[in-house]
């Protein structure tokens, strides 16, 4: 599991930062990539990374401001042009379906893979399978905006092979049956309960990716006990009133959310173009004063998520 930040700027592109897009690489977990937001020129940014459009399985849109969606039609079309055939599902607020349909229709763009658009109308679980589930809550922004909590389900513990070998049980199909939790009778009549030969489960990871937002309780709830919290930091602490007026957060407010939520790690993104060169490091310094395990994303930077 790895983050690849494709765009980390706020509002409009700048020389140093493109607009919002984050790839969550789940190559080891499911051989796929999930994309969060898709601002203008996202597919161009992808060319400089290991992200492959054909592997994008899901796209989660936080809200419908242009800096978060204007790259979507182009990416959807290019994925088809490059030979993508596997299904793709897009999640987002009401209006995302119309945006995609109109953009593809007017430009006569035809996708050759199954494309499904899910409009989120209620908070709660928007996706679940055997490996992950994704929950969402409304944030505090000028238009409807969602944050996403991605939860990896606990992974079954390993088969206690050494314990079985010590008992004289030879490797073979019986190992798989025990790993599946079956009750097995050996040739000598010994009964083995598979559940007694499975090690402790490996706890799954929790990832929280927030859209644009003021400091709010929903952010804390989504970030509770997260292994990684990705939070916007459009402004410095001295501009807190301006952040509030424009429905955004400061770096210190992001750190406060991480601290309150007992998150393990904080990554700041959505940085205003006013912070050029190394001036963005002041945002990092302010956040670390409150939450030490803070990093700040830059375009094309990767962040592994350890188990």
Swiss-Prot record:
Gene: rnz
Amino acids binding Zn(2+) 1: 63, 65, 141, 212
Cofactor: Zn(2+)
Family listed: Belongs to the RNase Z family.
Signal peptide from the UniProt entry: none
Taxonomic superkingdom: Bacteria
Entry keywords, A to Z: Endonuclease, Hydrolase, Metal-binding, Nuclease, tRNA processing, Zinc
Gene3D superfamilies, sorted: Ribonuclease Z/Hydroxyacylglutathione hydrolase-like
Record-given protein name: Ribonuclease Z
Keyword Ribosomal protein tagged: no
Cofactor annotation remark: Binds 2 Zn(2+) ions.
Residue numbers annotated as active site: 67 (proton acceptor)
Oligomeric and partner information: Homodimer.
Major enzyme class: hydrolase
